Design a protein with these regions (language model features):
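Alpha-helical transmembrane segments of multi-pass small-molecule/ion transporters
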Residues: 1-314
């Protein structure tokens, strides 16, 4: 377990670099990577969500009751800013339908699991970040389908009930199972959690392999446009999230947490939903995969910037 723990620490530390290398390999040499099928995406995401559940404790939800205003502000920002920004970018760049669906799905999904780590590295309010991730994830089965219907319903048929069931099965059930296992077998999970970065990164890398290798030719023709839109969506999320915190006169640690939480999305879920519910639009899976690569890079850069500014103030 010690060796595995060291490997896991290494993988967690260099996750962004690993994801970039694998994504580039799947893009330029799709053949070897195509052994990973897009049909695996839901199961792989379930593994990531189960891992998230293993790290959750009842105390993580205390912030919801002890500081409801902070959590509400963060979650409202999450589910208003990112969906609107996604839709606005699809209009500004006149994205074709299949790319637009993918971008909108990224915007309507809850906060990403790695946002908590980035908040910690940024010297932000980790309790708030964990609380926001937990609450936005619980709200996702209801809000993600409805927001997708609102912003993408004019372009394509959206089945909110079917999406609701998918999110419950792929996200809530694995998280709940992980939470229960952690509660009843805490001594075991305390050891197992050490290898979670390895397991989660492997699952995310395999999702990216599946999506990028299956669509490499199409990415080559429209990849730059997707990348520009994804970067703008992510960066605008960081900026507007931070701006909301400042506007409401929250302290800097809370502003950092909200900024990162709003900007970083559960893009694996966006990819999963695109593959399951919009299979007739293969490119809809691409924005989620590109976001998965990019937000780990931008999140690390932003966390480093926030940490340095916090040190200067101290």
């Amino acid at each position: 377990m010690k060796t595995l723990g060291k490997v896991s620490d290494f993988v967690g530390k260099y996750m962004a670099a690993i994801v970039i290398v694998v994504a580039a390999g799947a893009l330029f040499f799709p053949g070897p990577f195509s052994v990973v099928k897009t049909a695996w995406v839901n199961n792989l995401l379930g593994i990531v969500m189960f891992g998230m559940g293993l790290t959750l404790k009842p105390e993580d939800f205390k912030v919801v009751f002890s500081r409801p205003k902070d959590v509400i502000v963060g979650c409202v920002a999450q589910f208003t800013l990112m969906p609107f920004l996604a839709w606005a970018l699809t209009q500004v760049f006149h994205l074709p339908t299949e790319l637009a669906i993918g971008v909108i799905l990224v915007g309507t999904c809850p906060g990403g699991t790695s946002s908590n780590v980035m908040t910690y590295l940024s010297k932000g309010d980790v309790a708030l970040s964990v609380g926001m991730t937990a609450v936005s994830t619980v709200l996702a089965p209801l809000l993600t389908p409805l927001l997708t219907l609102l912003y993408a319903g004019q372009r394509v048929d959206v089945n909110p009930m079917s999406m609701f069931m998918s999110i419950v099965k792929v996200v809530l059930v694995p998280i709940a199972l992980g939470f229960v296992v952690n509660h009843f077998f805490h001594k075991f999970t305390e050891e197992a959690v050490r290898v979670l970065p390895l397991v989660s990164t492997t699952a995310i890398v395999l999702i990216i392999c599946a999506v990028v290798s299956a669509n490499s030719a199409k990415i080559m023709t429209s990849g730059l446009l997707i990348l520009v839109v994804v970067i703008l969506h992510n960066v605008l999320g960081y900026l507007t999230g931070f701006g909301v915190g400042k506007l409401l006169k929250l302290d800097s640690t809370k502003c950092r947490a909200i900024s990162i939480e709003v900007g970083m999305q559960n893009s694996g879920l966006a990819t999963s939903l695109a593959a399951a519910h919009f299979a007739q639009y293969p490119l809809a899976t691409i924005p989620g995969a590109v976001f998965s690569v990019w937000h780990n890079i931008s999140g690390a850069i932003l966390a480093n910037f926030f940490a340095r500014t916090a040190e200067k103030k101290d």
